[in-house]
Amino acid sequence: VGYEHLNARKGEWAWLLDRIFEEGKSLSALDACITEQIAELGKPGFKHQIVLGLPEAILDQKDWGELDGRTLDFSKEEDQLAATRWYIDELMKRFKAAKYKNLELSGFYWVAETNNYCGQLTVPISEYIHSLGKLFYWIPYWQSKGAEDWKALGFDVAYQQPNHFFNHSIPDSRLDDACAFARKHGMAMEFEFDEKATA
């Protein structure tokens, strides 16, 4: 299945928004859980920082949907930006309306793990995010296009992931290589694993 079969449309973007802010789930559940723990542990002197993911406006998608009475065409950067700004604005509006007691919105995460499809799109997105006083995060996969240029792409923080745990054919030296790459390019590290890591 290629990228062209996976393009989410406005309806799917809206569905994701609804899931993020669903009562009793996701952020709501996290906020309630923290409230329960405060009763036992005491109130911390901070709010827990939340970073929310941004779907990628896939280049050349022409069936995403309408915004302000106009059908968006993602072969045009202005339309990619319009959709992404709409999504960011919705996240900001809903987060504020939810009035979480223990959560604070720190910024946004670019979910695409490579720069193969978005070109320089992240730069104006970053500018918009910064205008809102928020930060922009990225976690490129191992040897992802653009990883070493993460600052030039507009990100404030980037985490290198080694893509090591789930493929047993990859030698453990990948971890050393990924750490060396991260040090060289001023990145943090992110490790993905499942329950087998503690077995």
Question: PLM ranges: what are they?
Answer:
Residues 1-199:
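Glycan-processing catalytic domains of CAZymes
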